[in-house]
């Protein structure tokens, strides 16, 4: 095999050189036509030798070794007691299989073997998987294994995301400077503040235009993501698991496999990167829309909270069926002593106090009106006021014999303890065996502190256990769907996505807040995996009051549903909701398969968000006025992503009523206009003057 390996797919190339004995990524980016002079490329990438530097050029490969002259954090950090902290790996073998290449390297002195696997998918997404094996007889402690990829020197900005509970994934963009911009997650889960993806971008890159390089970690535990520019001017991105003290100690012939890093390049902006990720995920055989359409869901939490009553819930089921709901979900409060949030977690047995005849009667009622039944669990958690905790207080994560501080009046079960694991699995499995349950909402409502298994740090074991739990429950109950919820928008990542079928995007159903939460979460996660519900007129989370149209239009852009006491909805409300669910069902094939587009705008007061069919035959857009416009006449609405050479019929549709405007007359095109795709994207159409916190839908159909 040549020293140079060229992977290319879908307009992306990755070129790796092993001439120096270590794999070095020479290029990750725009596709390079095969047949180029490999030797010439290698020569162009040999560093000069400045004064006051190493006497010979040093090749810094993917392992970033100090032994090769790299002055910075190496890819692998670890040691044996008093030795083998510095490494020098040499490639011993490489295997090319289509667009996947695997390198195995050995450091004979340190008695370590490392493997790096580069897979360039059909969608042009690069998956980098690495692992280290201890070939020695003594133990080797792994401190970290972080995967790094170089990006061009002309990258200018970092785009990543911050947040908090009920305001997740808010963008922040800043200049790349010398040093390291590091984002660490230490909650034991992917937190509300987690970035999900981190981009390095050319200076002018936007949603629609320019080059972007992004890294996302396929992992649901502690993590680190970074962008680094060294003093010599080289820039790289990295991601990996954040390991706690002695969390990974390898005995002889044991292996640590780091979480896969998912790397995406696009030369057509953030939306181009997003499209590659969505396409990759949708190509999975297990992707939910490859199995069935996404059903309209009613979750009754905000309708009843802990006040469970059969007659009330039966009336909700009747109302839900009337307006076209397809799935009914009973949330918290059905089990053990769970009459409030301070007791009962851990006792996954139907409460005789609330449901003396069991849940079967309610399930039968829900099924009788044509709805699926779903049920809420929070199996990783336990209240100290529970039968489980009283019997097994040692089954919680804890270090030093201390009980960790309570968080939402609960503790975390140590699922690495097989007894605790089997307790949760068996009680959950028993409920699923007894009742016809199509779907479970699985919550995770606290951070992990002092997360130890018998005193040893065990975040990794906890994450592996929940992956196992979901997989075993689904294997035992084919067709079961699991929604991952973690106080709403936590634990949304490319690790959990292979084990769950849906994410609860945020506990915040306020439509104004959801505009940005939904928009930026969907950069990585396809909208069909993101729960987006219409809440009541007055949001329980913020107290804001919004029109039906704004709430309904906002909730359309995901796996749609409701959180509303429908028994209190008026006849007009129910008619609106029936119209909206009918429209969602008519458009969900488009919404859940098309290319997501986010038009660049000159104002931050409004935004255009859309989905374009893969064949560009149709599209649906949302124009949202978030706050009052900067101008008396807002900037034009541009409909991006259409076929530039085709003509489209463009019109406003109002399945949930009209947006409230501040204008004597609407723009002339409202009832329909035929316009070329090129003009719709470049010139656009005059925007209406909407009141703040309003949104409208625009259809485009090729004619």
Language model segments and positions:
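Glycine-rich, aromatic-flanked loop segments that form ligand/cofactor-binding clefts
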Residues: 54-88, 207-223, 264-288, 325-332, ...
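Polysaccharide-binding surfaces and accessory modules of carbohydrate-active proteins
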Residues: 3-14, 22-228, 647-661
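Carbohydrate-binding surface patches
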Residues: 11, 199, 602-644
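Conserved, mostly hydrophobic/aromatic
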Residues: 11, 130, 253, 298, ...
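Aromatic-lined carbohydrate-binding/catalytic grooves of carbohydrate-active enzymes
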Residues: 291-426, 439
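C-terminal beta-sandwich/jelly-roll accessory domains of carbohydrate-active enzymes
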Residues: 627-703
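Active-site neighborhood of glycoside hydrolase catalytic domains
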Residues: 356-358, 392, 396-549, 559-564, ...
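Short Pro-Gly-centered flexible turn/kink motifs
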Residues: 248-267, 693-700
């Amino acid at each position: 095999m040549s020293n140079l390996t060229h992977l290319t797919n879908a307009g992306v190339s990755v070129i790796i050189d092993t001439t120096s004995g270590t794999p070095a990524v020479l290029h990750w980016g725009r596709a390079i036509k095969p047949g180029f002079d490999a030797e010439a490329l290698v020569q162009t990438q040999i560093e000069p030798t400045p004064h006051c530097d190493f006497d010979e050029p040093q090749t810094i490969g993917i392992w970033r070794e100090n032994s090769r002259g790299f002055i910075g954090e190496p890819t692998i950090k670890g040691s044996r007691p008093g030795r083998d902290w510095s490494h020098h790996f040499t490639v011993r073998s490489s295997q090319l299989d289509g667009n996947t290449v695997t390198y195995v390297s050995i450091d004979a002195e340190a008695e370590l073997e490392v493997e790096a696997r580069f897979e360039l998918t059909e969608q042009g997404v690069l998956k980098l998987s690495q692992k280290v094996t201890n070939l020695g007889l003594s133990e080797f402690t792994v401190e970290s294994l972080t995967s790094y990829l170089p990006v061009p020197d002309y990258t200018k900005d970092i785009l990543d995301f911050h947040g908090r509970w009920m305001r997740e994934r808010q963008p922040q963009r800043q200049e790349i400077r010398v040093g390291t911009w590091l984002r660490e997650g230490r909650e034991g889960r992917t937190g509300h503040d987690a970035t999900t993806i981190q981009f390095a971008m050319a200076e002018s890159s936007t949603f629609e235009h320019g080059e972007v390089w992004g890294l996302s970690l396929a992992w649901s535990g502690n993590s680190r993501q970074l962008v680094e520019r060294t003093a010599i001017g080289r820039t790289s991105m990295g991601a990996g698991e954040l390991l706690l003290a002695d969390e990974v100690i390898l005995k002889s012939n044991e292996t640590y496999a780091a979480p896969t890093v998912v790397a995406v390049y696009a030369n057509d902006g953030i939306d181009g990167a997003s499209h590659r990720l969505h396409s990759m995920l949708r190509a999975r055989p297990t992707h939910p829309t490859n199995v069935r359409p996404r059903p309209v869901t009613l979750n009754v939490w905000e309708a009843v909270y802990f006040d469970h009553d059969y007659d009330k819930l039966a009336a909700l089921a009747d109302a839900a069926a009337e307006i076209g709901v397809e799935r009914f979900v009973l949330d918290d409060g059905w089990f053990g002593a769970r009459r409030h949030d301070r007791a009962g977690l851990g006792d996954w047995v139907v409460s005789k106090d609330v449901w003396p005849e069991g849940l079967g009667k309610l399930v039968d009622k829900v099924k009788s009106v044509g709805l699926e039944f779903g049920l809420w669990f929070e199996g990783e958690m336990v209240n100290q006021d529970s039968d489980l905790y009283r019997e097994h207080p040692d089954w919680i994560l804890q270090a030093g014999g201390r009980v960790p501080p309570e968080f939402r009046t609960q503790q975390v079960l140590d699922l690495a303890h097989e007894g605790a694991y089997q307790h949760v699995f068996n009680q959950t499995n028993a409920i699923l065996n007894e009742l016809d349950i199509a779907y479970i909402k699985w919550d995770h409502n606290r951070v992990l502190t002092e997360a130890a298994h018998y005193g040893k740090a065990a975040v990794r074991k906890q994450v592996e256990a929940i992956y196992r739990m979901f997989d075993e429950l689904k294997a035992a109950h084919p067709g079961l769907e699991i929604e991952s919820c973690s106080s709403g928008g936590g634990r949304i990542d490319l690790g959990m996505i292979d084990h769950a079928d849906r994410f609860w995007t945020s506990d915040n159903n306020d439509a104004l807040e959801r505009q940005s939460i939904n928009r930026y979460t969907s950069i990585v996660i396809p909208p069909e995996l993101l729960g987006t519900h219409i809440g009541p007129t007055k949001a329980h989370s913020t107290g804001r009051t919004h029109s039906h149209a704004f709430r309904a239009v906002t909730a359309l852009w995901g796996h749609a549903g409701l959180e509303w006491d429908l028994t209190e909805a008026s006849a007009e409300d129910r008619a609106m909701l029936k119209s909206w669910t009918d429209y969602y069902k008519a458009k969900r094939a488009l919404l859940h398969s098309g290319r997501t587009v986010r038009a660049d705008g000159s104002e931050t007061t409004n935004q255009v968000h859309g989905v374009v069919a893969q064949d560009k035959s149709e599209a649906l857009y949302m124009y949202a006025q978030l706050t009052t416009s900067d101008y008396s006449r807002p900037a034009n609405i541009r409909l991006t992503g259409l076929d530039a050479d085709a003509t489209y019929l463009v019109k406003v549709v109002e399945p949930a009523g009209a947006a409230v405007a501040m204008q004597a007359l609407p723009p002339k095109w409202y009832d329909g206009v035929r316009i070329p795709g090129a003009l719709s994207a470049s010139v656009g159409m005059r925007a209406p003057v909407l009141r703040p916190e309003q949104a409208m839908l625009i259809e485009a159909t090729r004619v």
